[in-house]
């Protein structure tokens, strides 16, 4: 039994008569009595005793703490029950017990977090091994022991990160408001993929449910004009708010700040290109006492903090290593260390993360103050598409400057532009038919794949954008990285209702399609010209040259970019319009109608099934 209770005293006779039996409390606390009254007339106001009893503070649901507890339970199950099948059953029973006691949420015991629990279990195993080795070592340790520990940390880092273990990072493809996309090579099959990293700045139960739900929706999208989805997983990462240089007194070790590490050719990779955990940078000031830390050690075990370390040997050559932090804390903490932190320090279960012991060897002399934030990193593995519609339009515009006669317009290949736009509308029709609104359609999020340049829609904006860290999460100096150009680029394609913050639906995507249609058929000589024309579309102004050259396209640009949402055509209406009325497009239109009719038939079948069930119940 993890907890017990006893009921003392006699029950109220009135309650017995009423037949109401109260459930025994989980813990029997002594009855509260009124506090004795004292004469406080001569006591200063700031020292007066509170008149009301202290209220226990309420803490928000933090997934990180719960995940650590669940991981400990799973680890104990494996230790005490070697049979894998039985250990799973023991783990489930323990989780059910803790859930009933109110110590855990069933959400953190779900299979979606199995990869994170594996990460924690490996960390716990490594911590226990390191702690035992530390206890068995002599107080005075030589460099060989420290190098041995560091080599194990390097190997451990590769084991705990799926991203580092399975993929080789080749290049960064792009960055946006929801994260960064990297070109990687799978070490097993040798194929190239695109992996998008999305840093979740909050990790409450509701937030994680939103992200996981949307990932599952995206996983169900299968269409030739949608970027292919492969898999997704979550890893734990620590994001630091870097300051200046950190001196850490370890034999043959020197810790550099992120800024110095970037300048060093042999330095550590940028934080955004690695799932490893990075310890905070501190200010090189004289040692002084600091306030107590808010970091709590949940499992009362040895905490191995990480740092970006540059090893300097006798020849002054440098090699880069990274150490993992195995301790987990709240999602947003500000650790401040007093005096010196021994490597073997173990914080108290309920106490603050401080060190008062002195150690002559192997001490970490941490100076300054920093902020370490604990987040979850969502990784989405997708089909690799390197050429975007933005690249295609930019190259087309460069070629257009060679021609003076705009009426001839040889650089605008109407057939190619029509093909691109038709495939784009087909992809939008599919996602709208699935009940999904893209919200961020623009040339940078549309890709051309393969020799035939097949259109692929990607970079779906997560509807839970308020819990996704913006593009500044990789910024070194803590300042915003978004430029004026990037904001303009987003606003040019966003519908008026999106910019006004009002409710929007699939018709907002149709506005973006109207702007893209204009850009496909209207080359621009400069960025200023492009911004002026695309901004003028909001007020119904379309270039006269485009209206003369492409009257049908100009007509639908006017309809799609209209301020009246109800008058904008849908994706299906566009596919059935005169924009694509060729022999092949007629067949496509008929296929789209069949899809719509089949959907209606399925809905009618469901309604008939419900009606028949109701009649059966009435009989």
UniProtKB/Swiss-Prot annotation:
Main location: cytoplasm
Compartments reported by the entry: Cytoplasm
Site (Heme-binding): 80
Protein activity control: In normal conditions, the protein kinase activity is inhibited; inhibition is relieved by various stress conditions. Inhibited by heme: in presence of heme, forms a disulfide-linked inactive homodimer. Heme depletion relieves inhibition and stimulates kinase activity by autophosphorylation. Inhibited by the heme metabolites biliverdin and bilirubin. Induced by oxidative stress generated by arsenite treatment. Binding of nitric oxide (NO) to the heme iron in the N-terminal heme-binding domain activates the kinase activity, while binding of carbon monoxide (CO) suppresses kinase activity.
Effect on the protein of changing residue 483 to D: No effect on kinase activity
Consequences of knocking out this gene: Mice are viable and fertile without gross morphological abnormalities but display hyperchromic anemia in animals suffering from iron deficiency. Dramatically altered response to diet-induced iron deficiency shifting from an adaptive decrease in red blood cells (RBCs) volume and intracellular hemoglobin content to an increased production of abnormally dense red blood cells (RBCs) with decreasing red cell counts. The decrease in RBC number is the result of increased apoptosis of erythroid precursors. Diminished levels of phosphorylated EIF2S1 in bone marrow-derived macrophages (BMDMs).
Alphabetical keyword list: ATP-binding, Cytoplasm, Disulfide bond, Kinase, Nucleotide-binding, Phosphoprotein, Protein synthesis inhibitor, Repeat, Serine/threonine-protein kinase, Transferase, Ubl conjugation
Biased composition (Low complexity): 18-28
Presence of the UniProt keyword Translocase in the record: no
Tissue specificity annotation: Expressed predominantly in erythroid cells, mature reticulocytes, as well as fetal liver nucleated erythroid cells. At much lower levels, expressed in hepatocytes and bone marrow-derived macrophages (at protein level).
GO terms (BP aspect): acute inflammatory response; establishment of localization in cell; HRI-mediated signaling; integrated stress response signaling; macrophage differentiation; multicellular organismal-level iron ion homeostasis; negative regulation of cell population proliferation; negative regulation of hemoglobin biosynthetic process
Domain of life: Eukaryota
EC number(s) on file: 2.7.11.1
Induction (record text): By phenobarbital.
UniProt keyword Disulfide bond present: yes
Modification after translation (UniProt): Activated by autophosphorylation; phosphorylated predominantly on serine and threonine residues, but also on tyrosine residues. Autophosphorylation at Thr-485 is required for kinase activation. The active autophosphorylated form apparently is largely refractory to cellular heme fluctuations. Ubiquitinated and degraded by the SIFI complex once the mitochondrial stress has been resolved, thereby providing stress response silencing. Within the SIFI complex, UBR4 initiates ubiquitin chain that are further elongated or branched by KCMF1.
Phosphothreonine: residues bearing it: 283, 483, 485, 490
Positions of ATP binding: 173-181, 196
GO cellular component: cytoplasm; cytosol
Domain Protein kinase: 167-580
Protein name: Eukaryotic translation initiation factor 2-alpha kinase 1
Organism per entry: Mus musculus
């Amino acid at each position: 039994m993890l907890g017990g209770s006893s009921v003392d005293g006699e029950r109220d006779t009135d309650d017995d008569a009423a037949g109401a039996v109260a459930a025994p409390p989980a813990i029997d606390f002594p009855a509260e009595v009124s506090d004795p009254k004292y004469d406080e007339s001569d006591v200063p106001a700031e020292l007066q005793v509170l008149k009301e009893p202290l209220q226990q503070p309420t803490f928000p649901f933090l997934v990180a703490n719960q995940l650590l507890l669940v991981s400990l339970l799973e680890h104990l199950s494996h230790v005490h029950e070697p049979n894998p099948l039985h250990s799973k059953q023991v783990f489930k029973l323990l989780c059910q017990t803790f859930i009933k006691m109110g110590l855990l949420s069933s959400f953190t015991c779900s299979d979606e977090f199995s990869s994170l629990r594996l990460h924690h279990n490996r960390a716990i195993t490594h911590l226990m091994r390191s702690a035992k080795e530390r206890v068995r070592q002599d107080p005075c340790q030589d460099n060989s022991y420290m190098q041995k520990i560091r080599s194990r940390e390097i190997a451990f880092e590769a084991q705990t990160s799926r991203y580092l273990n399975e993929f080789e990072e080749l290049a960064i493809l792009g960055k946006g408001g929801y994260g960064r996309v990297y070109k990687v090579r799978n070490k097993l099959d040798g194929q190239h993929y695109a992996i998008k990293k999305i840093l979740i700045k909050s990790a409450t139960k509701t937030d994680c449910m939103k992200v996981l739900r949307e990932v599952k929706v995206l996983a169900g999208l299968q269409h030739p004009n949608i970027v292919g989805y492969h898999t997704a997983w979550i890893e734990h990462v620590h994001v630091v708010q870097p300051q200046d240089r950190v001196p850490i007194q370890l034999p043959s070790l020197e810790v550099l700040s992120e800024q110095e590490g970037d300048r060093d050719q042999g330095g550590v990779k940028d934080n955004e290109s690695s799932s490893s955990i990075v310890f905070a940078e501190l200010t090189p000031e004289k040692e002084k006492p600091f306030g107590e830390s808010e970091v709590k050690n949940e499992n009362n075990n040895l905490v191995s903090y990480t740092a970006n370390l540059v090893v300097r040997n006798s020849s002054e050559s440098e090699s880069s290593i990274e150490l993992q932090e195995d301790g987990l804390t709240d999602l947003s903490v500000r650790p401040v260390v007093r005096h010196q932190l021994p490597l073997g320090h173990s914080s108290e279960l309920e106490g603050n993360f401080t060190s008062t012991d002195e150690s002559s060897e192997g001490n970490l002399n941490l100076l300054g103050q920093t902020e370490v934030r604990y987040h979850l990193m969502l990784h989405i593995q997708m089909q690799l598409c390197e050429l975007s519609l933005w690249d295609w339009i930019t190259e087309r515009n460069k070629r257009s400057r060679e021609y003076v006669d705009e009426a001839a317009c040889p650089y605008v290949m109407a057939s190619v532009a029509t093909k691109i736009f038709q495939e784009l509308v087909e992809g939008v029709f599919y996602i709208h038919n699935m009940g999904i609104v893209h919200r961020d359609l623009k040339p940078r999020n549309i890709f051309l794949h393969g020799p035939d340049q097949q259109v692929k829609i990607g970079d779906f904006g997560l509807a839970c954008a308020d819990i996704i860290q913006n593009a500044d999460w990789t910024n070194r100096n803590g300042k915003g990285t978004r430029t004026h150009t990037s904001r303009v680029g987003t606003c040019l394609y966003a519908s008026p209702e999106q910019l006004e913050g009002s409710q929007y639906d699939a018709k907002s995507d149709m506005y973006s399609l109207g702007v893209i249609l204009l850009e496909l058929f209207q080359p621009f000589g400069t960025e200023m010209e492009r911004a002026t024309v695309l901004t003028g579309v909001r007020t119904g102004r379309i270039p006269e040259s485009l209206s003369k050259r492409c009257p049908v396209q100009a007509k639908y640009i006017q309809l799609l970019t209209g301020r009246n949402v109800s008058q904008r055509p849908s994706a299906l209406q566009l596919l059935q319009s005169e924009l694509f009325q060729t022999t092949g497009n007629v067949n496509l239109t008929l296929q789209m109608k069949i899809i719509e009719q089949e959907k209606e038939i399925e809905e009618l079948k469901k309604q008939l099934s419900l009606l028949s069930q109701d009649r059966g119940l009435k009989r």
